[in-house]
């Protein structure tokens, strides 16, 4: 357990795992380090843990493949977890909220990013006394139409999904996808 400092941790202050290890050793616990990109962009998300490079982990449900993938990964992480969002819509935020609610213990979460949107596809999750009550947010058809992407962008996303889906659903890839 960490004593309260000016800030809780420095999130992903270095690009590579060797740099994180060096900084972690230099700081000798004076400032806790957290992995984010080293987890969600890695082919082996536990490598940063095995290297002893961090004191905490920031996880985002959507980039990891959803709440189940996040919870599976969490079983192998001996550090405090911060469940955060990847600038998700209120609908996308459902995944992070579900994962955070399912964890036996979770540190403070970074799930209040819905306020960064000027408009969302549904009513955003609202903080109540510093907490986000869990509810399933469903898209509003009128807002979906209003926010619809141009046809060429829609096509780009469809092609990306077709390209990435086989990678994400391959049995050897149970934690993360390179897409």
What residue spans do the PLM features occupy?
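Flexible C-terminal active-site loop/helix
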Residues: 86-179
């Amino acid at each position: 357990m960490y004593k309260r400092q000016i800030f809780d941790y420095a999130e992903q202050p270095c690009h590579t795992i060797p740099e994180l290890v060096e900084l972690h050793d230099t700081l000798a616990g004076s400032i806790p380090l957290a992995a984010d990109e080293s987890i969600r962009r890695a082919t082996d998300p536990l490598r940063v843990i095995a290297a002893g490079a961090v004191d905490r982990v920031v996880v985002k449900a959507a980039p990891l493949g959803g709440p189940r993938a996040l919870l599976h990964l969490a079983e192998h992480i001996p550090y405090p977890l911060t469940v955060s969002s990847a600038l998700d819509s209120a609908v996308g935020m459902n995944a992070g909220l579900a994962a955070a609610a399912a964890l036996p213990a979770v540190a403070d979460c970074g799930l209040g990013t819905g306020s960064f949107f000027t408009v969302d596809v549904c009513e955003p999750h609202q903080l109540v006394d510093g907490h986000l009550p869990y509810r399933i947010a469903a898209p509003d058809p009128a807002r979906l139409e209003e926010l619809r992407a141009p046809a060429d962008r829609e096509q780009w996303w469809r092609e990306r999904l077709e390209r990435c889906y086989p990678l994400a659903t391959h049995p050897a890839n149970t934690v993360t996808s390179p897409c």
